[in-house]
Amino acid sequence: MDFLLKQVFVGLPKTVGNKEAVNPMEREWTSAIFKEPAEGPVWVGRTGLAGDGQGDLKHHGGPEKAVFAYSFENYRYWQSELGISEITSGGMGENLVMANVNEESIAIGDTFQIGEAVIQVSQPRQPCWKPARRFKVKNLALLLQKTGLTGWYFRVLKEGYVGIGANINFSGPALSPVDHPKMQSNYSC
């Protein structure tokens, strides 16, 4: 089965919510989880995509978390499980939406060429509270972790442009593969 780059998302931090809100889910907060579809090819550099940013540099971004990817197929699960149709591609704050690949089919160290860029799986995403706030599902971070549908991070081995519809060429498995469930146990919250 061929892997496919379905969508590319970028976004800068923004503040949403209400300073005066009593309900914690409605209070003001800042995040870059609200990403927008990229128009045309996007430059992937060593620390991320052009036009993208993070609201919390302590926990997000940097060379080992340069690109966040999420499986297109995971969204159908979340829509069904949570009954929230608004949970769609880009909703988890990812940069790349990849089809025909998921947390069970990749391992730390797997290397892919997408367009001009060469990227390597560096670690699973550690679910934080921001998707829960975005979709107002208090235990979403825990659900993401329990299901293993967390997404994963890439480090960038070769910078270059990526664009929607690009084939994703699997250019090398990890020398000592660590599958995603094992990755999760090493990076849990």
Please describe what each predicted stretch is.
Residues S85-G93, K136-T150:
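Short, basic/aromatic beta-hairpin or loop at an interaction surface
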Residues L143-K146, T150-L157, I168-S171:
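Active-site scaffold segments
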Residues M1-I114, V118-K130, S176-C189:
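Electropositive, beta-rich accessory/interaction domains or terminal extensions
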Residues E116, G165-A166:
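Residue-level signal for inorganic ion chemistry
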Residues E36, L157-G160, G172-L175:
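Short, contiguous, pocket-lining structural segments
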Residues P131, V137, L144-Q145, N186-S188:
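Short, intrinsically disordered/low-complexity patches at protein termini
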Residues G109, E159-G165:
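Loop/turn positions that initiate beta-strands
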